[in-house]
């Protein structure tokens, strides 16, 4: 009986761990989304393009497999690995 109980506990722990998914905030509404498998990094990128003085900066949030590259028109780039950390 103890063996059966121990087996059930181990199976439950393994299943709970396998079912974990990352959530990140996603533009345009900054609502949490479940990231696709393999995309375990949340990012927040703020960039300024040609019409930035008129329209303001472009904000992009989402999931990624790797941290996006910092480009010349980017003002800031945040990459993090905890749920909804890209705010």
Swiss-Prot record:
Tissue-specificity statement: Expressed by the venom gland.
Leader sequence segment: 1-21
Cellular compartment(s): Secreted
Disulfide topology: 24-42, 35-63, 48-52, 67-79, 80-85
GO CC term, one of those recorded: extracellular region
Keyword Disulfide bond assigned: yes
Domain of life assignment: Eukaryota
GO MF, one example: toxin activity
Swiss-Prot/TrEMBL keywords: Acetylcholine receptor inhibiting toxin, Disulfide bond, Ion channel impairing toxin, Neurotoxin, Postsynaptic neurotoxin, Secreted, Signal, Toxin
InterPro entries in the cross-refs: Snake_3FTx, Snake_toxin-like_sf, Snake_toxin_con_site, Toxin_cobra-type
Entry-linked Pfam families: Toxin_cobra-type
Function: Postsynaptic neurotoxin that binds and inhibits neuronal nicotinic acetylcholine receptors (nAChR) with high affinity (IC(50)<100 nM). Is a selective, and slowly reversible antagonist of alpha-3/CHRNA3-containing and some alpha-4/CHRNA4-containing AChRs.
Assigned protein family: Belongs to the three-finger toxin family. Long-chain subfamily. Kappa-neurotoxin sub-subfamily.
Subunit structure: Homodimer and heterodimer with kappa 3-bungarotoxin; non-covalently linked.
Name recorded for this polypeptide: Kappa-2-bungarotoxin
